[in-house]
């Protein structure tokens, strides 16, 4: 029986994700599969590629032929080079870890609490604050008798 390693499409319109599967060469794209050996999510940045390397090596060794898209994925993960005894590919780009939402919220809360203690930033509010705090103190802009 001729087997192929191919992509089985899942997801909705304009949001595809794929399973990397081993199936009989005569089956349809989304038909019956023998074994699922990985996943591929092209829309995420960087795209997510998960391949069970041990199972991929097994199926390649028993003669399963990868389709062109799967061959490209296997080259990126290094499974094809391992099968063909070629040098390993350069390392893949790894997604940055996401920041913890709780820490972001707490930092924003601390910043908001610190904003209440700051002095007024607009001139009108600054004059009101100055007149309320120093009602008997002369204003800096007011002319004095000694200064003329």
UniProtKB/Swiss-Prot annotation:
Which keywords accompany this UniProt record? Ribonucleoprotein, Ribosomal protein
One Pfam family name is Ribosomal_S16
GO cellular component, alphabetical, reads: cytoplasm; small ribosomal subunit
Q: Which InterPro entries does the UniProt entry name for this protein?
A: Ribosomal_bS16, Ribosomal_bS16_dom_sf
Q: Spans of biased composition, class Low complexity? A: 129-148
GO biological process: what's one of them? translation
Which parts of this chain are annotated as the region Disordered? Answer: 107-148
Ribonucleoprotein as a keyword of this entry, yes or no, is yes
Q: What molecular function does GO assign, one term? A: structural constituent of ribosome
- Identify the Gene3D superfamilies for this entry: 3.30.1320.10
- Where do transmembrane segments lie in this chain? none
Q: Which domain of life is it from?
A: Bacteria
State the similarity comment: Belongs to the bacterial ribosomal protein bS16 family.
PANTHER family in the record: 30S RIBOSOMAL PROTEIN S16, SMALL RIBOSOMAL SUBUNIT PROTEIN BS16M
Q: What is this protein called?
A: Small ribosomal subunit protein bS16
Which organism encodes this protein? Answer: Frankia alni (strain DSM 45986 / CECT 9034 / ACN14a)
Gene this protein is translated from: rpsP
């Amino acid at each position: 029986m001729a087997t192929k390693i191919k992509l089985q499409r899942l997801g909705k319109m304009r949001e595809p994700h794929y399973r990397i599967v081993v199936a009989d060469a005569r089956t349809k794209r989304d038909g019956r599969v023998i074994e699922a050996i990985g996943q591929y999510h092209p829309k995420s940045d960087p795209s997510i590629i998960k391949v069970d390397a041990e199972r991929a090596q097994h199926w390649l060794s028993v003669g399963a032929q990868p389709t062109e898209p799967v061959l490209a994925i296997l080259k990126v993960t290094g499974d094809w080079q391992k099968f063909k005894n070629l040098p390993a590919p350069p390392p893949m780009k790894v997604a940055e870890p996401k920041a913890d939402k709780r820490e972001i919220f707490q930092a924003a809360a601390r910043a908001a609490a610190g904003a209440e203690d700051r002095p007024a930033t607009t001139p009108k509010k600054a004059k009101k604050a100055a007149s309320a705090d120093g009602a008997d103190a002369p204003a800096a802009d007011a002319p004095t008798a000694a200064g003329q």
